[in-house]
Every structure is written in C-alpha cells, then in structure tokens.
C-alpha cells in the first residue's frame, strides 16, 4: 500500500491506524505492508499505480482520478457523511463506478465531513457586485478538487502537489491556498497564511481503493477483515476529525490567524458558486461517459438538500 500524503499529516495517520487495526485483526489471514507515501510513488500517479496493479492499495483523494471516475464529485459536493452514504446506497454506487471505470474496489471513504477553506497571506477583499471573495490578481495553489470553483472566482491558479506549497508560499509564487479546515499547522503553512476565509465548503474525498484483480483473488475471510475495519473507520474517523476541528481552530487563533467572514449575501453566493461548479463538472463528465441518468441518483444519495 501507498498513501498520497506525508506521514505527519492527520489524514495519513488515520490510514496508518487503519493498517494497524487490519494487521492486528487479520493475523494469519491478511496483512497490509505500507511502502510509503509520495516519496515512493508521486501522489498524482498513485491512482494509476493501483489501477494497473503496481501496488495493491492506495489511500488518496478521489479527485486525483476524478476525470476517470466522475461520480467522485458527489463526495466533494456531499452534504452527507460516509456512514450515511454507506447506509443509503451511495457508497455501493460509488464502488460500482470504481469497479467499472477504474479497475479498483472502493473500500472506504474515510475522514469524511471535513470542509475546505481558502487561506490567504494578505487580507482578503470581497467583490462589491455579489459580496463574494475577490481573488482577482491573487495567485493561489490549485489541485483537481478546487479547479472549477477557483476559475469561477477568477483566481490565477498554480497547480501543484501539497508537498510543494510550503516552498511556493515562502518564495511568493503563491499567496493563497485552499486546504481542509484542519491541518494547516501540520504543514507549517501558518507561517505564511494569516487569514482564513469563512465559510468552509465541500467535503474531503479521501478513500482507500484496492486493485480489483487483487481484491477478487482474496479469500472471503481476508475481504471481510479489510471491509469490516474500513466500515468502522468510516464512522470513527469522521467523529475524530469533527473533534479535531475545535483544536485546530484554537491553534490557528493562538497563532494569530484572523477569521474573515462573508456577508450573508456574499456567503450564499460563494457557496452557490462552490457547489454549482462541482455539480456542473460532474454532469459534464457523466454525459461524456454516457451516464447522465445517474446524476440525479447521486445527488439524492449524497446531497439531498
């Protein structure tokens, strides 16, 4: 197995705890050997590696391969957490899409329910017309999860892996970063970013995926251990991250970060741009795959309100 992010990041720790739990419970049945993170296989190349059987398991944001499995954007735009979609059939639909389109078993959506915020070096400005964050002239780090939204905010985007963002902030190549509400201090980006723009948007789309040929070759006992622990981790990790949020917010405030809010009108427009851009991208990609009939189903399971 490999993981997208460095081991010190909270999300990687969740995955490594999952591995430990599987190895304990799966003694004599199934064991996971972790080969490393982005230093072993570059983070954006990991999904292809598990699809092609170079590795058996990857812990990664779904957005890194969202062009191939457009259903992933339903997790990004989700108003539900993993336990809910596991129960209502959303996860089964996500798994079927992964098996059909990407030759992987979708084992778990972990750390669900954590939102994203935009963090800036300089004091943020707001557009007078609609009250939305004005990113005109702002150089912002991009990755696939945010692209559509940042374009709608007219930002100047620089796609780069998170491992390069510290250096880019230090050199002034970028002066803003979107990231999950938690974890900025783990990455040490708080040395540069001093403003956190509210509200948060989206949900993390971190999943554990397994090469389908490898999965199909496993014994029923091995599959059961992997899946049972994964389902437990969906519930546990969501609760753990919700508890973490207050701790991180306190750490940000103690470090001098300022929290900047939209006006009521601006917030409504900001969130509409965020979510409309994701559903538009999902719809367009699903049409290209001949699956536009599934868009309404995904919306009902992941974002019913």
Language-model-detected regions and their locations in the chain:
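N-terminal secretory/targeting leader peptides
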Residues: 1-84, 106-305
């Amino acid at each position: 197995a490999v993981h997208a992010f460095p081991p010190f990041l909270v999300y990687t720790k969740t995955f490594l705890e999952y591995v430990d739990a599987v190895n304990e419970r799966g003694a004599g049945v199934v064991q996971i050997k972790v080969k490393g993170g982005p230093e072993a296989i570059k983070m954006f190349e990991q999904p292809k590696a598990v699809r092609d059987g170079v590795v058996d398991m990857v812990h990664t944001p779904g957005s890194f391969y969202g062009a191939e499995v457009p259903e992933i954007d339903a997790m990004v735009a989700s108003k539900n957490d993993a336990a809910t979609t596991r129960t209502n059939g959303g996860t089964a639909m996500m798994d079927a899409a992964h098996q059909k389109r990407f030759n992987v078993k979708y084992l778990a959506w972990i750390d669900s329910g954590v939102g994203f915020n935009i963090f800036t070096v300089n004091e943020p400005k707001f557009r007078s017309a609609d009250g939305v964050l004005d990113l005109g002239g702002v150089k912002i780090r991009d990755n696939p999860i945010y692209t559509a939204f940042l374009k709608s905010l007219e930002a100047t985007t620089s796609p780069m892996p998170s491992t390069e963002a510290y250096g880019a902030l230090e050199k002034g190549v970028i002066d803003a970063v979107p990231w999950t509400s938690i974890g900025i201090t783990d990455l040490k980006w708080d040395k540069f970013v001093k403003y956190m723009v509210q509200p948060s948007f989206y949900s993390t789309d971190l999943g554990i995926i397994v090469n389908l040929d490898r999965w199909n070759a496993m014994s029923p006992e091995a599959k059961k251990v992997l899946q049972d622990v994964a389902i437990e981790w969906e519930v546990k990790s969501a609760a753990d991250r919700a508890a973490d949020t207050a701790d991180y917010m306190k750490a940000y405030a103690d470090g001098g970060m300022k929290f900047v809010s939209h006006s009521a009108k601006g917030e409504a427009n900001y969130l509409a741009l965020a979510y409309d851009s994701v559903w538009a991208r999902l719809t367009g990609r699903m049409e290209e795959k001949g699956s536009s009939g599934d868009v309404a189903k995904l919306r009902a399971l992941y974002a019913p309100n």
